[in-house]
């Protein structure tokens, strides 16, 4: 009887798990979404990417092409953006605290209301960059840059 019952039920177990049905007292299945970038994507072509409100703490985007990317309110704390192309990127309200911004191209980027605290940023290209209301405390974003 038990073996015939298991032959009847076993083919439907995957469906029961997906539907959230399980044996009494069983814990619900917890699946974490897979991060395709795994917070590391040096040299990637991410033009026009949508990273709004993304948690990218400590990400590695060295040399990546993020031109025109939407990074509004993204958390890039401690991220390495060395040599990244962020021309025309929308970084309004983004957190770039302690980020590595050496040689970053921020021409025509929008950093209004962004937190750029203690960021290391020599040789940054800043022509046309908007930064009204941005917190630049402890950063050399403007001093270390230019075209």
Give residue spans per PLM region.
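Bacterial N-terminal signal peptides
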Residues: 11-19
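Short helix-capping/turn motifs at alpha-helix boundaries
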Residues: 1, 18-21
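Bacterial N-terminal signal peptides that target proteins for export
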Residues: 1-11
């Amino acid at each position: 009887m038990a073996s015939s019952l298991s032959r009847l039920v076993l083919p439907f177990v995957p469906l029961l798990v997906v539907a959230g049905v399980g044996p009494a007292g069983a814990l619900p299945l917890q699946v974490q979404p897979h991060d395709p970038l795994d917070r590391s994507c040096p040299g990637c072509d991410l033009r026009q990417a949508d990273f709004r409100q993304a948690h990218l703490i400590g990400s590695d985007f060295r040399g990546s092409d993020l031109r025109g990317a939407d990074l509004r309110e993204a958390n890039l704390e401690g991220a390495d953006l060395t040599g990244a192309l962020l021309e025309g990127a929308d970084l309004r309200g983004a957190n770039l605290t302690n980020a590595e911004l050496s040689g970053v191209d921020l021409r025509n980027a929008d950093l209004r209301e962004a937190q750029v605290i203690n960021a290391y940023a020599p040789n940054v290209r800043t022509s046309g960059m908007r930064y009204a209301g941005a917190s630049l405390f402890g950063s050399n974003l403007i001093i270390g840059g230019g075209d």
